[in-house]
Structures are given as C-alpha cells and as structure tokens.
Amino acid sequence: VRFSDRVLGNAKKFAKQAKILQFDVDAAEINKNIRVDAAVIGDLKEILKRINAELPQLGHEAWIAHILDYKVKYPLTYQEPGLTGPYLVEEIYRQTDGDAIIVTEVGQHQMWAAQYYKYKNPRTFLSSGGLGTMGYGLGAAIGAQVANPGKQVINIAGDGCFRMNMNEIATAVRQKLPLIEVIVNNHVLGMVRQWQDLFYEKRYSATVLDDGVDYVKLAEAMGATGYRATTRETFNEALKAALAAKTPVVIDCVIGCDDKVWPMVAPGADISTAFTGE
C-alpha cells in the first residue's frame, strides 16, 4: 500500500531484478521513496478491473509449488512452553479445522495469525496489513459475521488494540452476533516493544500497559461472556466453550511480554538480511 520503511527496508536494494509499476490515487506519491518504471494515477479498484481485462490469467503453478516445498523444508516452529501467541493461533486452527474467518488487529498477534493459521479458503483472513490501524479488527469482525451468519468469526487482538475499539463488543451483543474476541494479552504494545528491545537497548517508552484492566469484567459489563486463560489447558477449554456459544465471547489470554515475532528485518536493512532470533 505504501513504500514505507516496513515495505522497502533498504530502498537501494529493493526489488532490483523487478520492473516496478506504482498505482496511487495521489500523484505526489509517485517516485517519492523509490524510482519506478511506470506509474498509474487513479482509483485502484477501477485500474485493476481494466488491467484484469487486458492481462492473461496466470495460475503460477510452478511458483506456488516452489513456495509449498519451502514450507515443508523450513516450517515455522516455536520452542517456548506454556501459553504463547503461536500456540493460541495453532489451537484456534485445530478447534475450527481451518474453517473460521480470522480477523486481526495490528501488531505481533497479526503476524502470528498470518504465520500459524493454515488458511484453507480464500477471503477468510481479514487484516489491515501494513496500515497500522489499531482497532480495525473488531468492527471488521462484526461486518464479517453479519455478512456470513453461518460462519465462525474470530478476531485475534492484542490488549492494546482491544482498548482502541472495545465498545463495539456492546454492538455485537445487541446484534446477537456469535463472534469470538481472542485477546493476546502481553500487557505491552508488543511490536513496538520488540523494536525497543532489539534496537534501542531495552529503553522502553510508552509501551507498557500493565495497569490492571480486567477485560473479563469489561466483557461481562457489556453483556458478553468473558473467560481468562493463563495456561494451554484453560485456553483450550475456553475456546471450546466459546465455539459452542451463540453470543459474543471474549477470551483474555495472558502471555509473556518477551515473546517475539520471527523472522524480522532490522530498520534500514534489506530482506536478504532477515534474522530469526536463533
């Protein structure tokens, strides 16, 4: 969506073997951060309709097979015991058999949801990508549930994101929507804290949220069912109960504040220098 540091890394090394075509509604963004080979200014929805009509439809079978082979050879793993972000996402996949619509907020939980849930069907992962829109997920989950009343919708949120738009739990209750809100509660703004931990000598600023907010009571105050999970066993039980419920459920999942998302690229580096934390 934007040629920012999160997308480019080292701008001088970005996609050196590719032809770059930039679409943007704002002409001022063209060639702003990188030089492109061609540009189209206008509404992306209309532009893509025209391009799809002109281009041959490619299946990219060889490339997809190559990526699937990499996933087998180099699977994502984690060794941390107890309740962790990756475990939460994997358990959601196990109990839903990959048939849920997964929505995310923004942060570490967003990355874990992309990495550890095995998506079987198109249009079942709703995320704002790199836009950084904390608070997006709950409203998007409500919309997804209204549009798909026969599907299970689960919003995976960090505790920081839940605070941004948690009042919409009351909307879900009022509309009798059986969505599930899974709060990955590490008591910090995890993505920013990870950067502070790795690149700023653990000088933590404005990222600690350990102020005793009780998300279970907040959920109950708005008419939803609330559970708190501190172990794998209690999360498994809470999720099973939530999936059987016919009304909104909030599960407050307490995890450690030092869990990291891997791999990652350091600020100003390029994708070839991504590191895994090992």
Model-derived regions, located:
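Glycine-rich, acidic loop regions that bind phosphate or pyrophosphate groups
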Residues: 1-66
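Glycine/aspartate-rich loop-and-adjacent alpha/beta segment that forms the canonical ThDP
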Residues: 6-7, 11, 232-278
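Short coil/turn connectors at secondary-structure junctions
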Residues: 16-19, 35-36, 97-100, 120-123, ...
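Short beta-alpha connecting loops at secondary-structure transitions
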Residues: 30-38, 123-127, 164, 193-207, ...
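Active-site diphosphate/adenylate-binding microenvironment
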Residues: 68-144
